[in-house]
């Protein structure tokens, strides 16, 4: 059998609900289902459950249990394959209440969540509803979306619909960046100031002359010797100065490291400062009398010529080594002069 095409589902339900249609069904659910089998189509799917079909003047019978419904469901499944059965036209969608969706659909209250391209993809889904929601409903539930929730890196405020965007939304990102720049400049200013300001103590140390320079200025007024004596004094000073200046150089290096040696261009070694003519003459005179000095005599000489005890001691050591070297060279020269190599 086939269903007539001009019959609507409501035409079957109306005679059943009429007061004169009571003879068509009884209280048992099985006999009621047989009345629907005459049409051989899934018309009863649009009707309510069996308990709602009882008479208005009678209360729902407690003997009617849920175990009577499987016979009704089995008959619905046995009516035929949905491909062969008659298919009614898709009814027009019912108007939905404002802001209500089925539980399987996720609500998106924030219109700024996606860009314009991604919002266009959700257009066909909205067409299924006959009465789509107005834009104002979405604008009421709009909340500010953080930057890390946005789907695209571009500013979503530029992609908003006219109902969701405003003049303040476009100015907000630029005002935030402008407010961050003064803070960065404020943080950079103390760093620049810290780089420029340095302690002035190294300059004062470099301006103060060393004690050796003071001694040389005082000793310049001493008597001048012959040119040969000045050459000898220079030679002696060249031998004695490296040894005398080692300890003082180490002490000054430690002092410079504590005062910030990296600011100056000085090297680690102290500048070579030879003895003056007056100092070398006094030391040579004492060396002729005695090659080895006692501690008391060494202190007296150091006070008279403005030298330290250590400097006098090292000068005498170097002078003895020089005399020893000269004696060895003279002895070798005498030995070689006796032999004539042909």
UniProtKB/Swiss-Prot annotation:
Biological process terms from the Gene Ontology for this record are: anterior/posterior pattern specification; embryonic limb morphogenesis; negative regulation of cold-induced thermogenesis; neuromuscular process; positive regulation of cell population proliferation; positive regulation of transcription by RNA polymerase II; proximal/distal pattern formation; regulation of transcription by RNA polymerase II
Compositionally biased intervals (Polar residues): 1-11, 204-219
- Which positions does the record tag as DNA-binding? 268-327
Cross-referenced InterPro entries: HD, HD_metazoa, Homeobox_CS, Homeodomain-like_sf, HXA10/ABDB-like
Q: Tell me which SMART domains the record gives.
A: HOX
Q: Where's the Glycyl lysine isopeptide (Lys-Gly) (interchain with G-Cter in SUMO2) crosslink?
A: 106, 195, 254
Q: Where is this region: Disordered?
A: 1-29, 187-271
Q: Which GO terms describe its cellular component?
A: chromatin; nuclear body; nucleoplasm; nucleus
Q: What Gene3D superfamilies does this protein map onto?
A: Homeodomain-like
At which residues is Phosphothreonine found? 8
Residues annotated with Phosphoserine modification: 189
Q: Does the keyword Transcription apply?
A: yes
One GO molecular-function annotation for this sequence?
A: RNA polymerase II transcription regulatory region sequence-specific DNA binding
Which key words are in the record?
Answer: Developmental protein, DNA-binding, Homeobox, Isopeptide bond, Nucleus, Phosphoprotein, Transcription, Transcription regulation, Ubl conjugation
Q: Where in the cell is it found?
A: Nucleus
Q: Which family does it belong to?
A: Belongs to the Abd-B homeobox family.
Q: What does this protein do?
A: Sequence-specific transcription factor which is part of a developmental regulatory system that provides cells with specific positional identities on the anterior-posterior axis.
Q: What is this protein called?
A: Homeobox protein Hox-C10
Q: Which organism is it from?
A: Homo sapiens (Human)
Gene name of the record: HOXC10
